[in-house]
Structure formats: structure tokens, C-alpha cells
């Protein structure tokens, strides 16, 4: 009886351990897969530096285009679309962290003027919701509602990202005025080349850390290489570690120089930034403009009628 209870206890403990391990694995995988925007959030208080450079460029080294479309002007307390376009060749495949090839993901950061923010769900129209799809936006900081981030998300489905934006109302927010405002955007496609701690990913070129002769290249069991470089002058050895997924450009017995590329460049993605302008329009100014245009049209009509009346008078006088 005691033995049976012991086995039962052991079985329960094993089951509990497996369950806990599985939960930790799932949480870890989820945090890693959604970590890219968090890299910037954890390391930079503001994603846009004083020079105007968006900090995502510190990890995504290649330059690629990005575009943004916003209305020329919006009225207070209205919802509008900010469409970020991240174009790239959909046939391209990138090197994943496990060394295999896979589809590119995309991400974006949208820096709005103070007072502008993500529109609440109940203010978004069904048509706009259809354009947004299953995207989930988040604030860069809890106290920075005007800075939004998204990604990584599948690039083949979301190379165009629609942000639903709520315009502020100066009547309720005294810090907002009827002015022309700048909007800044950054967008990337594919993985970065450098992690926030300065270490390289396997999506970049690896260079020789020393000059000399390549005496040995060992292919590691789980992928990647160990390249041994020997300096002929003093027989000093240096071992360069190449992560999995990269293609070697060198071979054993080859003479190489310091900083010479050991691998080809696998990166097919890149980062770009752009800007746009939007006017927060005063409704009274719009009404005034409409009134002015209406008065001009009426004045033109009266002039035409007056001219016709004058011509009739002249014609009648000529008949006499």
C-alpha cells in the first residue's frame, strides 16, 4: 500500500513538472516572438532621437523605403486612417534564428503629435476594422499614447498597416491647437542584424577577428561553424564562431585579412523612416470658408443676372 502511494506521488510530481515546463516554454516562445518592438521600448525612452533618427535603425542596418498616407486635414474628435506601407519582394526568404529560411515579418512605429492617439474600438467603423484585420497595436509607453508600435506581424499579409487614429479636440484639451502637425513613421521588414546588447544576430555578415591562415573549419553538430585562424608570425590561434544559417565564403588553407568577410550577407530586409503633415482644422474656419465660397458664387450669379438685364435694356433702347 505504501509503495502504491509512493508511485502515485511520483507520477503526480512528474505530471506537474511537465505541465510547468510546457507553460514556461509557451510563455518564453511567445515573449521571444513578440519581442522586437519591445527591444526599442526597453532601451529608449523616446523612439525618435534629437537628430530625427528613429532608434530602430540601430538594429536594422540596411536602408529600405517606407511610406505613410494620412488625410491633408482632419476635424477635432474624428477618427481617420494612417496607412503605413512597407514594400518588399514577397518572394524573398530570410534566415530565421534556427538557421532555416522563412517568410519576412514587418513592424512599424508611428509617432503622432501630442494629443493624437489610437482610436477606441467603439469609434472605429466596420470598413476600417476590415482594413485593420487582426492587428493589435500598443502604446510605446503607458504615458505616451501618441506613439504606437506594431509587430512583428506576417509581411505577406500586412505590408500595408492601417492605424485608426483619433484626432484631439482643443475644446477639451488646452494643450492642442488648430495647427499643422508633423507625423513620423518607421517601418522594417525582416530581422535585425544587431541585438540591443550589441551582439550580432545570424542575419548579418561575420568578419574575421584576426588575420592569418585558416587552419581548420569545423561544422558544428547543431549548425554553424568554428573557424580556426593561425597567425604565421607567432602561431597564435583565434577561433571565430559562425552561427547557423550562414554561407561561408572562405575555405581551409586560405589566407585572410583582419575584418575580411567570412560569410555572405544573408540580410534581405531593412528599415526605413518617413514623415507626413496633417492639419487639425477648426470647424468654424471651415464654415467660414464655405460661407465665403457661397457668397462668391452668389455674387457671380447676381453679376450675370445684372449683365443680362443691362443687355436687355440696351437692346430695347436700340429698337426705339
Swiss-Prot record:
Superkingdom of the organism of origin: Eukaryota
Subcellular location(s) of the protein: Plastid, Chloroplast thylakoid membrane
Residue positions binding heme: 36, 56, 59-60
Cofactor: heme
Organism encoding this protein: Draba nemorosa
Entry membrane topology: Single-pass membrane protein
GO CC term, one of those recorded: chloroplast thylakoid membrane
GO BP, one annotated term: photosynthesis
Annotated signal peptide: 1-35
Cofactor binding summary note: Binds 1 heme group covalently.
A GO MF label: iron ion binding
Subunit composition and interactions: The 4 large subunits of the cytochrome b6-f complex are cytochrome b6, subunit IV (17 kDa polypeptide, petD), cytochrome f and the Rieske protein, while the 4 small subunits are PetG, PetL, PetM and PetN. The complex functions as a dimer.
Electron transport found in the keyword field: yes
Keyword annotations: Chloroplast, Electron transport, Heme, Iron, Membrane, Metal-binding, Photosynthesis, Plastid, Signal, Thylakoid, Transmembrane, Transmembrane helix, Transport
Protein family according to the UniProt entry: Belongs to the cytochrome f family.
Protein name: Cytochrome f
Keyword Disulfide bond part of the UniProt annotation: no
Functional summary from the UniProt entry: Component of the cytochrome b6-f complex, which mediates electron transfer between photosystem II (PSII) and photosystem I (PSI), cyclic electron flow around PSI, and state transitions.
Record-annotated membrane-spanning stretches: 286-306
One Pfam family, short name: Apocytochr_F_N
Main location, first listed in the record: plastid
Gene3D superfamilies noted in UniProt: 2.40.50.100, Cytochrome f large domain, Single helix bin
Stored SUPFAM superfamilies: Cytochrome f subunit of the cytochrome b6f complex, transmembrane anchor, Cytochrome f, large domain, Rudiment single hybrid motif
